[in-house]
Amino acid sequence: MFLAVKIPIRRFHVSYKVFESSKKSAKEVIELINSSSLSNKETFDSSSNVPEWKRQKLALKSKFKGEKWNPKKKLSRVEMDTVRLLKDKIPSLTASDLGDKFKVSPEAIRRILKSKWQPSAEEISKIEDRWKKRGIRVEEIMKKRKIWNSHIGPNGVTNTLVIGSGNNSPIHTIKKMVSNNSDDKTNTSKMDLARKKSKLELLKKTLNQ
């Protein structure tokens, strides 16, 4: 007698996206992987206990739609004044030439040249105050660098020991017991003179004999 046994057969549905990706470029494959990743599906609620760094990361991702953050360069007031001055002195310079020089778009150069805005006396005083404060900060940084360089020995090795990572952490100087060079020179010269005298005495003795 033969028994009829039914064996269940499972059929798997395989997506052809992976096979199609072999025909695509590397950039398209990376975009496909990023679009299917779990990080793209992440959402957060303002009331949930999400860390601040994660909240900021997700907010930037939703704002820039997954693109890399690449802010446009903005020229300072001094650079804007130099753009206007160059255009006045050399009218043959085009917006594209100035844009290549200052690494901005020609449209930004056109807007700077078209603008008629001039700072008031109060704004000029505020700008000068900011520059003064900036100069004070630069002087403080240079002083700190000089102090740090004074702690470095001739061989490039620091002779200071900082305990702790705070700004008010104590600094201990490492003192080296180095013999004075002048004392060493005097000692060696005395020894040389004694040797010379002993040699002369030996010569005198040999001659007298």
Swiss-Prot record:
Cellular component terms (Gene Ontology): mitochondrion; nucleus
Location(s), subcellular: Mitochondrion
Keyword flag Transit peptide: yes
One Pfam family matching this protein: Neugrin
Keywords assigned: Mitochondrion, Transit peptide
Transmembrane segments: none
Record: transit peptide: 1-19
Family of the protein in this entry: Belongs to the RRG9 family.
Purpose: Required for respiratory activity and maintenance and expression of the mitochondrial genome.
Protein name: Required for respiratory growth protein 9, mitochondrial
Higher taxonomy: Eukaryota, Fungi, Dikarya, Ascomycota, Saccharomycotina
